[in-house]
Swiss-Prot record:
Subunit structure and binding partners: Part of the Tic complex.
Transmembrane segment boundaries: 11-31, 58-78, 86-106, 131-151, 167-187, 213-233
Organism, as annotated: Physcomitrium patens (Spreading-leaved earth moss)
Organism lineage: Eukaryota, Viridiplantae, Streptophyta, Embryophyta, Bryophyta
Protein name (record): Protein TIC 214
Subcellular location per the Swiss-Prot or TrEMBL entry: Plastid, Chloroplast inner membrane
InterPro entries, alphabetized: TIC214
Function of the protein: Involved in protein precursor import into chloroplasts. May be part of an intermediate translocation complex acting as a protein-conducting channel at the inner envelope.
Length: 1603
């Protein structure tokens, strides 16, 4: 027993690791992803939590069981696709989940009874079924609360990938189940904690939980409504398709699509433009998604520019999380190890197959089989349709049963083509037919005749009309028709009545054809008459229908013909309107075009643009300037732009910078500033109140005026601040939302009508009635005139005038302003305006500007803006305008009158009491005198004060106050004075002084105003001069700065220019050095070629060399005058062109090529000087058989590849390289020389041929033909690469495109010569080559003899041995081929019987050819032992069926392979002589019998090396070839040493190997090259990697083709 906990954990961990190793990784993946699906919570989980908290454990477990059952059905729905599409489509969320959620919320919204809060204790309770059903349905519908349900859909992806593995599905389910069980255990723990910790009764807590869950369900419903689009109402674009309204097309669509707008854009959020400055540029249809990342290729890290962004980011995060560090060396080593391992496996497999062949197995069993595609029923697909079939024939060529039977199937082909043509051109034919109908029926031509009924109605119409021209035409038509009838009746002499009737019918037909009543007359009618005419035609059709209907009803027995006529009439009636209407051809176009309308702004409720721009509330025009240009004034909506630059109709994107977290949120807010909005602003004194404190004035006298500071001033100190423009805009923006605009605009209209027609008339009427009551004259006319002047102009929300009567567009939504022109002001009277006019003049003088003129002032139009509460403002949302008070002038007048009346009454009373006061004694006189003196002094003070106050600004106010105060003092003093006379005199003096001072004050004010004006004018002039001087200085400085900038830019440009020139000089110098290198390289290469030629010459004997030189000198001397100049010119031109057109890549390639050629043997010279020597061939054949094939092993294939040339030119090309004249002159020379020459020996003939070959070789190849040869060989390599990669058996005929106009000295290979010819007693056997066989070794032919042009390819060993002596054996007909033995289609049940039967067959065939009796006796004795086998074949009990198995289903029949047939027959079709029956078979591998081995034991002439690559599949062959060619070893020293050894041995034996001419050279060389026989595969693969379509980038790969 383990008591230590760490040991327990270690044991548990070890058991887990062992389980992981044993179990498959899919189980772990399933558990992991199943557990991940528990993270997104849906309504089913919420419902189960609610059941646990409110109704106890039993209800919770029931809810969990329903949830598990629903999830299990979802997992299993993957195996049934209709159920999967039903459950997991997004349409189900909107169509099923939302209504069910609403129904569930309505059910749990209110707590109707406390019984629902009691826990469930028994299964019989009805609530259990509801809980189970709800949880099951919610889990089945699978809605998720998260905005992106990736975790839920992630597991679906793995389900589709591993749905065939049921363990993965089970592990996912158990992972999901374990996660949910853990989740619900946590909920139970939460339930226990709530019950224990709740301070109140748990029933009351349940009420709160009940209410919270109902709110939470409602929040879920709102979330789903926000995520899912409304299915029925979506905004469409302007280019939307117009569907046919008559047909209910949407009913024919499948069930989810007719609920949703499937034409809407899902995720094109933005409209991308090519040009950022213009809006007319086309849209980028496809945006490239280049994402750079490191990728592995050939074991090395390289940059890939088309990586998946999500995958690369995930890989990067995973590496950082797991601390994985990748090393380049380790990666390369791992790659090498894997490749080496794969190579070893393939080689081991090949070795095993070869060993099986050695053990005696049949090739059929050893060859690697290829799997073919088949159905569940076991039926294999045909080879053409098989996707596993490789080659160019898959799905490209239609292969018939036999290409000779094409004429027999021509009729069927034509029929099928017609059917296909009709199907493809269905729309085209329909359009043409419709157009014919329109052209002939629906749109009648003017010269076409009218029907009989149409003619009759037209005649009646013309007769009733007043048109004289038409009546004349009618008379002419009638006259011509009568004459035509008379002529026709004269010609006919008919006796019978039937014949007369028939003749009348014919006459009517002819008459309609020749009738002059055509549609031209209808066109000449007036439009009104034409309309009447067409109506009459319709009416006539109805009449015909009514007549036929009456006839049907009147007749008792209704005939079928009458019914048919009636149906035809109905059809004509209903198709009458359609005939004259053009039938539109409708085609469903792609809805979302790339050209969308993208304006700068979008007017609300118009929807002109296709992309949502900033909303414009309204547009207006302003005319400004002397030119009176119109300016567009637009007001943008101040609402938040939640849909900025989105395509209309597209799905809304999830935006990360603009959140919506409130129930009603008018504006967008960034989450970055949320915390700032939450902070509370501390108490601060408003700036408006601080502005009231005169800070400057306080700081002047701080000690004295501290007491006067008031933070909260009184009413007298407050000065109201006017609203600025910003304040008005803020108020306007505050009111700028639809509901407020709607209420405000209606209030404004009501206020305007209420003011104009209710308030103002009531005021006018009441004022004039009161005037009548006060016995004053009423002012009806003046008031009503002012009332009529007042106008109400409707304006936009910005204040742009629209009109007096009409309202602006969208005024309820955009808003409204009402402008009052000449607003009405109620005045108490209209005559007393003296004081007001004086005040206005004074104010005008004070507020004058520079453009002031003393006598002229323009009158401004008085206006104001009406508010929603009936007030007036100077501007929209401005300050309330103060109206002149109605009672103020009345108060003033009353005060004046009251003062005057009191003074007069006081004087009267005072005069009455004056008589009583006469008794006053003389004592009072002194006091009166003193007081009079005081009065005089006071008068003087008044004068001084007046003079002082003239300079003060407030002289208009202070002066009357001082006068009134002094006047009141005098009155008080006069009351004490008893002398009446003196008081009256003083009063008169004071009044006179007052009037004088007033007149002086007016004069002084005028002077002061004029002085001010002059002072302002002087100041403005001085300022203008000062500012003009400043502007000039600034302009001069700006010019200097521009000049400095230009100089700096010029300096920069010159420096850049010098750099460019310097770079060009460097480039030219570098090119010059490269040219020098090129020249040296050419020299070295030519010297090397000459040296090699000199070395090779040493092989020959000195006698032969001397003879060759003599012949060469003779030929050169003879033809140097004729052709020397031409050859030199050719040399110069070729060299110059090659030097000039050499590229840098080509130069480096040549250098690399020269370096490589130094370390390898070159067989070109021997190939060029090829001669057939029978003696050498025999020796080489013998040596090859005895020699060990150590140099032909698998390890040395690369070196053999470099030493064999894959290329040979055809004779057609050589034939046309040289001109024809040169060939004729040489033939002529050879004829003359051959007549004089004696008979030479065989050695001398050989020497002569060698010398001739060399001379022509020098003449042609060294100069121009060598370059042509290189170019053609290069083209061959690139073209052969393409053709051989697709089909290596196919021989491409691409050299026909490179034909020159020149002629050559070389013969054509396709010359068919049937006889052996002997010239100069020299006998030779001629063997021909065909173009159909792959040519490998180049052979040059020459003009050896004078009389005839022949091919020289001498073979002393004949391919067909003794049979070649007969001409009949060189040819074979097609009929003879059919007599060959067919492939056996029966398989022996036992291998022993099969071997014994083979031996019997071979012995029987040998007996026919054996001549020696001894051998035949021994063979017959052996045959007797096995003769009992033949009896088994003829026994009834045994027979053939019991000894053999029918293997037709495995082995194909003779020529049943269609692709093989096509390849074989296509060769005959391509050849010129494909219709000939005779076929030359000397160059083909014939099926020889086993008897030849026994016949020719001494002569081993059929020695062919075996090709091993056919054992393996082509795919594995290619893989093994590539792996063998790649240098997978890091130490290259061993390889270099091995190469040197091979090169030495090859140099020693190269002459012997090159002179081999076996029966079939293709097989030997193919054996040497079989691993690299298709090296082009590598090039094609690399071509795909580098994304090139030609061979221009092969130099970078450094893949050298075998030369």
């Amino acid at each position: 027993m383990i008591t230590n906990t760490p040991l327990q954990f270690s044991v548990l961990w070890a058991s887990i690791l062992s389980w992981i190793n044993i179990s498959s990784p899919l189980i772990l993946f399933g558990l992991y992803y199943g557990f991940l699906t528990t993270l997104p919570i849906g309504p089913s989980q919420i419902l189960s939590i609610r059941a646990f908290l409110l109704e106890g454990n039993l209800s919770g477990t029931v809810a969990v069981s329903g949830l598990i059952l629903g999830q299990l059905i979802i997992f299993l729905s993957i195996y049934y696709s209709p159920l999967y599409t039903l459950l997991l489509k997004p349409h189900t969320v909107t169509l099923l989940v939302l209504p069910y959620l609403l129904f569930y919320w309505y059910r749990i919204k209110d707590l109707l009874d406390y019984q629902s809060l009691r826990p469930i204790n028994s299964i019989k309770d009805s609530r259990i079924y509801k809980i189970f059903f709800d949880s099951f349905i919610f889990q089945l519908l699978n809605p998720v609360l998260l905005p992106s349900p990736i975790l839920v859909r992630l597991i679906n992806l793995f389900f589709f990938r591993y749905s065939n593995n049921f363990l993965f599905v089970l592990s996912c389910f158990f992972g999901w189940l374990s996660g949910h069980l853990f989740f619900f255990n946590c909920i139970k723990f939460l339930l226990i904690r709530i019950e224990k910790d709740s301070p109140i009764l748990y029933l009351l807590v349940k009420r709160i939980i009940y209410r919270t869950f109902s709110i939470f369900v409602l929040a879920c419903i709102l979330l789903y409504l926000g995520r899912a689009p409304v299915p029925f109402f979506t905004k469409k674009l302007n280019d939307e398709l117009q569907f046919n309204k008559s047909g209910f097309l949407w009913l024919n669509k499948p069930w989810p699509t007719f609920f949703f707008d499937y034409y809407r854009w899902n995720r094109p959020f933005r409209y991308i433009e090519n040009n950022r400055f213009t809006n007319k540029s086309p849209v980028k249809k496809s945006v490239s998604q280049y994402f750079f990342n490191i990728s592995l290729s050939d074991g090395k890290q390289k940059i890939s520019f088309t990586a998946l962004p999500s995958l690369s980011i995930f890989e990067k995060d995973l590496k950082t999380y797991l601390n994985i560090s990748t090393n380049n060396n380790n990666l390369y080593k791992n790659w090498l190890d894997t490749k080496n391992e794969r190579k070893d496996n393939l080689l081991y497999e090949l070795e095993n197959r070869i060993q099986a062949l050695d053990n005696g197995l049949v090739i059929k069993e050893v060859i690697e089989k290829k799997t073919s595609l088949s159905n569940n029923e076991g039926i294999n697909l045909t080879k053409i349709n098989d996707p596993f079939l490789n080659g160019s024939f898959r799905g490209k060529a239609i292969i018939t049963k036999s290409p000779w039977l094409l004429k027999e199937n021509s009729y069927k082909l034509k029929k099928n083509r017609k059917i296909v043509y009709l199907k493809e051109n269905k729309l085209k034919i329909w359009i043409s037919n419709r157009w014919r109908e329109l052209r002939r029926k629906n749109l009648p031509l003017p010269w076409e005749p009218l029907n009989k009924n149409a003619r009759r109605s037209l005649v009646l119409l013309i007769q009733g009309s007043k048109n004289k021209k038409l009546k004349r035409k009618l008379q002419q038509i009638h006259f011509s028709e009568e004459q035509a009838l008379i002529n026709l009746t004269k010609q006919t002499n008919i006796s019978d009545l039937t014949e007369k009737l028939e003749n009348k019918h014919l006459l009517n037909k002819k008459f309609t054809k020749i009738s002059h009543f055509n549609w031209e007359l209808v066109l000449n009618l007036s439009p009104r008459q034409r309309a009447v005419y067409f109506k009459e035609l319709e009416y006539e059709k109805w009449q015909i229908l009514v007549r036929s209907w009456k006839n049907l009803l009147s007749v008792n027995s209704i005939n079928s013909t009458q019914l048919n006529k009636f149906i035809l009439l109905l059809k004509k009636l209903f198709t009458f309107h359609k005939k004259f209407a053009l039938q539109e051809i409708s085609k469903e176009l792609p809805r979302w075009t790339s050209k969308l309308r993208n304006d700068k702004f979008d007017v609300i409720a118009i929807g002109i643009t296709d992309i949502r721009q900033r909303k414009v509330k309204n547009l207006g025009y302003l005319i400004k300037g002397k030119e009176k240009r119109r300016k567009i004034v637009r007001r943008f909506s101040q609402q938040s732009d939640f849909r900025r630059r989105l395509v209309k109709g597209s799905m809304r994107s999830r935006r990360r910078k603009t959140l919506i977290w409130k129930i009603l949120q008018l504006k967008t807010h960034s989450p970055f500033f949320l915390r700032i909005n939450e902070k509370h602003i501390p108490f601060q004194i408003s700036l408006n109140k601080l502005n009231l404190i005169d800070v400057k004035h306080i700081f002047k006298n701080p000690v004295e005026k501290q007491k006067k500071i008031a933070l909260f001033p009184t009413k007298n100190n407050v000065t109201l601040k006017k609203k600025t423009k910003a304040d008005r805009l803020a108020i306007a923006n505050r009111w700028d939302f639809p509901l407020a605009q709607w209420g405000r605009s209606w209030l404004l209209l009501i206020q305007s009508y209420f003011r104009k027609y209710l308030i103002l008339p009531i005021l006018i009427i009441s004022k004039n009635i009161i005037r009548l009551l006060l016995f004053q004259t009423p002012e009806w006319s003046e008031d009503w005139n002012d009332w009529n002047k007042e106008m109400y102009i409707k304006c936009t929300y910005d204040g742009i005038e629209v009109s007096e009567k009409a309202l602006p567009e969208q005024w309820l939504r955009d808003g409204l302003q009402i402008k009052i022109i000449y607003p009405f002001i109620l005045k108490p009277w209209h005559n007393l305006q003296l004081e007001t006019n004086i005040k206005k003049n004074l104010n005008d003088l004070m507020n004058t500007n520079d453009n002031f003129s003393t006598n002229i002032k323009k009158k401004k139009i008085k206006y104001s803006y009406l508010t929603a509460w009936g007030f007036e403002t100077n501007a929209p949302f401005g300050d309330i305008k103060k109206k002149p008070s109605f009672w103020k002038p009345i108060r003033k007048e009353l005060k004046k009158k009251w003062k005057k009346n009191i003074l007069l009454n006081f004087n009267k009373i005072y005069s009455k009491f004056s008589l009583v006061k006469k008794k006053i004694t003389n004592n009072s006189n002194n006091s009166i005198n003193n007081e009079s003196k005081d009065l005089v002094k006071e008068n003087i003070k008044i004068n001084n004060n007046l003079k002082f106050n003239l300079t003060n600004k407030n002289y208009n106010k202070k002066l009357p106050e001082q006068i009134s105060s002094k006047f009141s003092q005098t009155i008080l003093s006069e009351n004490q004075i008893k002398n009446k006379y003196k008081i009256s005199t003083n009063i008169q003096k004071l009044e006179n002084l007052k009037f004088l001072k007033k007149s002086k004050i007016e004069k002084i004010t005028k002077k002061i105003n004029f002085d001010k004006i002059e002072f302002f004018n002087k100041l403005n002039n001085d300022n203008k001069v000062y500012f003009t001087n400043k502007q000039k200085k600034i302009e001069n400085k700006q010019k200097l700065i521009k000049y400095y900038k230009k100089n700096i830019s010029l300096v920069n440009k010159w420096s850049y220019f010098f750099k460019l020139n310097f770079n060009k000089i460097n480039k030219n110098f570098f090119q010059f050095s490269i040219n020098i290198i090129r020249f040296n390289i050419n020299l070295i290469s030519k010297i090397q070629q000459n040296l090699i030629l000199i070395k090779n010459r040493k092989i020959w004997n000195p006698l032969k060399v001397s003879q060759i030189n003599q012949k060469k000198d003779k030929i050169n001397y003879k033809y140097s005058n004729d052709f020397g100049e031409k050859i030199q010119s050719l040399k110069i031109n070729v060299n110059q062109e090659n030097i000039l057109l050499m590229s840098q890549a080509y130069l480096f390639h040549k250098i690399w090529q020269i370096e490589k050629t130094n370390n390898k043997c070159d067989f070109k010279y021997l190939l060029k000087n090829w001669t057939s020597n029978s003696v050498i061939k025999k020796k080489i054949n013998r040596n090859l058989k005895k020699m060990d094939l150590k140099f032909l092993k698998e390890q040395n294939w690369k070196n053999w590849l470099q030493n064999f040339n894959k290329y040979n030119l055809s004779s057609q090309v050589w034939y046309k390289l040289a001109p024809q004249k040169w060939r004729n002159q040489i033939n002529y020379q050879w004829k003359g020389k051959e007549q004089n020459n004696l008979k030479f020996s065989e050695k001398q003939i050989k020497a002569l041929t060698l010398s001739k070959e060399k001379t022509f070789f020098y003449k042609l190849f060294i100069d121009s033909l060598l370059e042509q040869n290189r170019k053609i060989s290069k083209r061959y390599k690139y073209n052969y690469l393409c053709y051989s990669y697709l089909d290596f058996k196919k021989q491409p005929n691409f050299l026909e495109s490179t034909k020159n106009k020149k002629e050559s000295l070389f013969n054509n290979e396709i010359l068919q010569i049937s006889k052996n010819q002997v010239n100069n007693n020299y006998k030779q056997d001629i063997s021909l080559k065909s173009n159909l066989i792959l040519w490998l070794i180049p052979t040059l032919t020459e003009k050896k003899y004078i009389n005839k042009i022949e091919t020289i390819n001498r073979n002393n060993i004949s391919l067909l041995k003794e049979k070649n002596k007969k001409n009949s054996r060189n040819k074979k007909t097609l009929r003879e081929r059919e007599r060959h033995e067919t492939i056996r289609q029966w398989k022996w049940k036992s291998k022993n019987i099969e071997k014994r039967f083979k031996e019997l067959g071979d012995m029987a065939s040998l007996m026919t050819f054996m001549q020696d009796q001894e051998n035949s006796v021994s063979l017959s004795a052996k045959m007797r032992e096995n003769l009992d086998l033949f009896r088994l074949l003829f026994c009834r009990d045994v027979g053939v069926n019991k000894l053999t198995i029918n293997s037709e289903h495995r082995l194909p029949r003779v020529l049943d392979d269609q692709i093989l047939m096509y390849k074989v027959i296509s060769l005959f079709l391509k050849s010129k002589n494909r219709f000939k029956k005779n076929v030359n078979i000397t160059n083909f591998n014939l099926s020889t019998s086993r008897i030849e081995f026994f016949q020719n034991n001494n002569q081993n002439n059929n020695f062919n090396l075996i090709n091993l690559e056919d054992i393996m599949l082509l795919k594995h062959r290619k893989e093994l070839k590539v792996l063998n060619l790649l240098n997978l070893k890091q130490n290259t020293n061993q390889i270099l040493n091995f190469n040197k050894v091979i090169l030495k041995e090859n140099k020693r034996k190269r002459i012997e190997l090159n002179k081999i001419q076996n029966k079939n050279q293709n097989l030997t060389i193919k054996h040497f090259l079989w691993p690299t026989f298709r090296l082009e595969d590598l090039a094609c693969v690399n071509r795909f990697w580098f994304n090139t379509s030609n061979g221009s980038r092969f130099t970078m790969l450094r893949i050298r083709m075998y030369t």
